[in-house]
Design a protein with these regions (language model features):
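C-terminal structural segments of small proteins and small subunits
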Residues: 62-90
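Short S/T/G/P-rich N-terminal loop/turn motif that feeds into the first structured element of a domain
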Residues: 1-54, 59-70, 93-95
């Protein structure tokens, strides 16, 4: 069953964040993931949520998503992301 990660990211160093994105894309794809959304236009329909940048990606399973997310390689790249942005993230299984 497919699994999805959804991030709401507040970027405060765009140049550094772009460096992170360039490095993480091939790692994500090599692990079986694919981007579904990366910072496109979005609209809030309910609540007082004010997302900055929405990033979504899909993996074939939650197991593969977690293998990617908790891998040493991604965690090293995540430290770059943490230096230039803050955010929230969730993972959810598809139907």
């Amino acid at each position: 069953m497919a699994a999805y990660a959804i991030f709401d990211v507040d970027i405060y160093d765009l140049e550094r964040y772009q460096d992170f994105m360039a490095q993480v894309k091939p790692v994500l794809e090599a692990a079986g993931g694919k981007y579904l959304a990366r910072g496109g236009a979005h609209k809030v329909y309910e609540g007082d949520w004010n997302p900055r940048r929405i990033v979504m990606f899909e993996f074939p399973s939650m197991e593969l998503l977690e293998e990617f997310y908790f891998s040493d390689l991604y965690q090293g790249l995540k430290s770059i992301r943490d230096e230039c942005s803050s955010g929230r993230a969730v993972a959810v299984e598809g139907v």
